[in-house]
Amino acid sequence: MQSIFGTDGIRGRFNEEITYSLAYKVGYALGSNLENNNPILIGRDTRISGDILLHAITKGINASGKKFINLGICPTPAIPFLIKQEQLSSGIMISASHNPPEYNGIKIFDHNGQKITKNFENKIQKFIEESNQNISVTTKEISLKANKELMDIYMKSLIQSMGGENLSGMKIILDTCYGSATTCAKKIFQSLGADVRVLNNSKNGLKINVNCGSTNLEPLKKALRQSPADMGFSFDGDSDRVIGLDSKGNVLDGDHILFLWGRELMEQKILTNNLLISTQMANLGFEEAWNKIGGLLYRTDVGDKYVHDAIKEKRAVLGGEQSGHILSKINNFSGDGILTALQISKYCKKKNITLNNWLKTSFEPFPQKLTNINLNFNINKVNQKTRILINQTTENFQKIYSDNCRIYIRPSGTEPLMRVLVEAKSHKKVDSLSSEIANKLILEINKIMN
């Protein structure tokens, strides 16, 4: 049996890679392998399939003899926060993050609120394989009433992260993209005194991430043009990432957030070794500007778990990804889009500066283009020999095209895509190289597959 775990838990199209049966088995395997008898916390985003998978997982947990608490629809970061806060044994988030509505996923957290280790993933996998014939889906009905009190505790923690600061006098637009942020983002910002307008704020599992949210900023840009505000924030489906816009529609991505937030911590002398952690996707303009003010940038592979591991290893206090996953010491390094948006808003209010003017003090990004090459297969599911050949091909391309530019090629961890990042000092060079590399790379991959 091929590994059910990818780069960020289990993810795939519902009723294809992610099924009721698999979800039941994961719940059963997790419950059976936990020594701690405290309840397992479960949450989900708004996807239609989320309710079906919730039923399956909870029945599996129940069959294993363990108890669970249903948090209902919630941001992913609520799960790790509450696991630690309430001393629970583990947690599961049912979500496919920024992926389209037809996808779903299962993220598992340990008793410390950290994503489970590779070793524990292997343990779950082995248990499912060995118990495959013995697991039967029970018909016993169990209560799935959502625990609103725990959700209130999470929301209060975000308000408390402001350290007594408020957002009165600030006009802010939020795009909650029909996802998890619909449960609490508006309420939190309003409770802090902000004048809030919210887009796509209904729980709609058919529209989650569709032409909205952190991967499509057009609705937020349009709203800022039609109804001026100080800033806007766009979340993804499970609210663990955020992208901002200033009053003029300029983009505040994860690189800008790290630079501005990191510089504040540096000035307060609480940024360990002036070090930030980011990934291979981080813009070279960001790195050069950060180095110029005395900072260090350590790059990891793409994925917040790699950033998290490097933060722990290097004893850093801040890290993240260009995509808007920001991990800070405030909440034990769990990516939280709402927390990040609050911190950026707080600094603007405290410094008495507009986001537009603050953003101008950061850096000028190098032209950068990310091209998605559609494959008719998921590279993570091909045999090892084929995967090695494809990896060797991408490494060769990165070496061949490394003069006067930066190339980074990687497969998507969740979709049948190869992502090609090209970065150079001119848009013309970026465009021509992106097209050339994408065309040649797909030919080479097709040769390997045929």
Swiss-Prot record:
PTM text: Activated by phosphorylation.
EC assignment: 5.4.2.10
Catalytic activity: alpha-D-glucosamine 1-phosphate = D-glucosamine 6-phosphate
Cofactor: Mg(2+)
Gene3D superfamilies named in the record: Alpha-D-Glucose-1,6-Bisphosphate, subunit A, domain 3 (3.40.120.10), Alpha-D-phosphohexomutase, C-terminal domain (3.30.310.50)
InterPro entries: A-D-PHexomutase_a/b/a-I (IPR005844), A-D-PHexomutase_a/b/a-I/II/III (IPR016055), A-D-PHexomutase_a/b/a-II (IPR005845), A-D-PHexomutase_a/b/a-III (IPR005846), A-D-PHexomutase_C (IPR005843), A-D-PHexomutase_C_sf (IPR036900), A-D-PHexomutase_CS (IPR016066), Alpha-D-phosphohexomutase_SF (IPR005841)
Enzyme type, top EC level: isomerase
GO MF term list: magnesium ion binding; phosphoglucosamine mutase activity; phosphomannomutase activity
Family matches, as CDD domains: GlmM
Residues the record lists as Phosphoserine modifications: 97
Cellular component, GO, one term: cytosol
Keywords from the named record: Isomerase, Magnesium, Metal-binding, Phosphoprotein
Residue positions of the active site: 97
Biological process (GO), any one: UDP-N-acetylglucosamine biosynthetic process
List of residues binding Mg(2+): 97, 236, 238, 240
Keyword Isomerase recorded: yes
Cofactor note: Binds 1 Mg(2+) ion per subunit.
Its job: Catalyzes the conversion of glucosamine-6-phosphate to glucosamine-1-phosphate.
Protein family according to the UniProt entry: Belongs to the phosphohexose mutase family.
Designated name of the protein: Phosphoglucosamine mutase
Originating organism: Prochlorococcus marinus (strain MIT 9312)
Gene encoding the protein: glmM
